[in-house]
Each structure stands twice: as C-alpha cells, then as structure tokens.
A protein has these predicted regions:
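Beta-strand-dominated extracellular/periplasmic modules and repeats
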Residues: 1-212
Length: 212
C-alpha cells in the first residue's frame, strides 16, 4: 500500500448530519407520495398466510419538550410467533416461517404523529450463551432530524408480566422504574388487539435506549 503524502491529521472531519427533514423521500417514498418501488416499504408485515396472533402496534414519539414529532422514521425487527428470527444467524430448533420477514419500516403520520405497525405477536427468544430466554419483544430503531445517530430501543408487552420479570435485558436496567418505559399497553379496538407504545426522546419520561 502506498503511503499518503500527508498524515491523517490533515484530513478534516466530516460534519455530522441528522436524517431529516426529507427522510421520507429516500427511505419511505410512498409516504412522501412517490410510488417508485414495486414493493414499497410499509408497517404492514402480517400477511394472510403468516402464523401467529395478529396485533397492531401504535404510538407517538415525543421530543424533550413533550411535543409530538411528526417526521420520524421507525423500523422494527422481531422474531416470529415461535420465537425465531428470519435470519441465517438464528439457528434455533424452532419453526421458521419464511412468509414472515420480521422487519418493518414506516414513519409517523404527518398530521397525527402516530406510527402504526401491523404484525404478529412474537414468541419468546432463546437467550445467548446459556442466559435465560428473552420475553416476547419487538426491536425498534428511530431516525429523525435532530438525531445524529439512530436510536435503538425495545418494546415489551404488558400481558407478559412473568416473562418480563425474567428477561435478561430488562433486568440489566438498574433503575427498575425506568423499565416501564419499554412496556406497551394492551387494548382492543374494532376487534383488533392493539399495543400502544409511546417513545420519549428526552426528558423525565425518556425511554431507555440501547447502545448497539
């Protein structure tokens, strides 16, 4: 390899940038009014043939001042109903439903600020290296203007209290009262099971985020 004629100290650092305000055009074109892909990304990943209980996950995302943010990109990644991810690295001896991709991408509504994911309820996931099984959960990743690095968090289910109490990730959160920021609330609406999961980016009610 030929050495550079000058040291790295002469290379200026690239300025950081946030994802917005045009994040939807590049990452969720259908939400910006551009139907340019055959299969546009969406938050509806529970096809008719997918095994599992149909659920709706919805919520709003608040900034540090308590205002609803309306331009956030939301991605989710989850196991199937048997607790297995559709990924080569997951080699559990559990049913792999190839019809369920487990990954969704959507955005908060420009008017209401509500994001919506239509999916199935995941099963418990085997723990790594002999650890206890992880309670059913959905992984979240957020990007928006004002956020330099995407934020990662998790959503757990309030009707899985026993499993949540044993979850190894929830239990590493030292301030036990903050674990509640990761618990979604169950309700029923028009015959559908709905879990409400609001996310707070900053402030006294800040959601727990993970360095992944």
């Amino acid at each position: 390899m030929t050495p550079t004629p000058f040291g790295l100290s002469y290379l200026p650092e690239t300025p950081s940038q946030t994802a917005g305000p045009y994040v939807h055009i590049g990452l969720i074109p259908s939400q910006a009014g551009f139907e340019i892909f055959r299969n546009n990304f969406s938050g509806d990943i529970a096809g008719a043939d997918v095994e599992g209980q149909r659920i709706v996950i919805e919520g709003r995302i608040f900034d540090g001042a308590g205002h609803v943010t309306k331009d956030v990109l939301v991605e989710t990644w989850q196991a199937n109903a048997a607790g297995r991810y559709n990924h080569p690295a997951d080699r559990q001896d559990k049913l792999l439903d190839q019809r369920f991709r487990g990954w969704a991408r959507t955005g908060t509504d420009f008017n209401t600020g509500i994001y919506t994911i239509r999916t199935i309820k995941p099963g418990s996931v085997a723990g790594r290296k002999g650890r206890k099984a992880m309670a059913p959960h959905v992984n979240f990743w957020l990007a928006s203007r004002g956020i330099n690095i995407g934020l990662a968090t998790r959503m757990y289910f309030d009707d899985e209290e026993a499993a949540n109490a044993q979850d190894p990730v929830l239990n590493i959160i030292e301030q036990s009262e903050r674990r509640r920021t990761l618990i979604a609330t169950k309700s029923e609406r028009d015959g559908a099971v709905v879990y409400t999961f609001d996310i707070h980016l900053q402030g006294e009610r800040e959601t727990v985020f993970f360095d992944v």
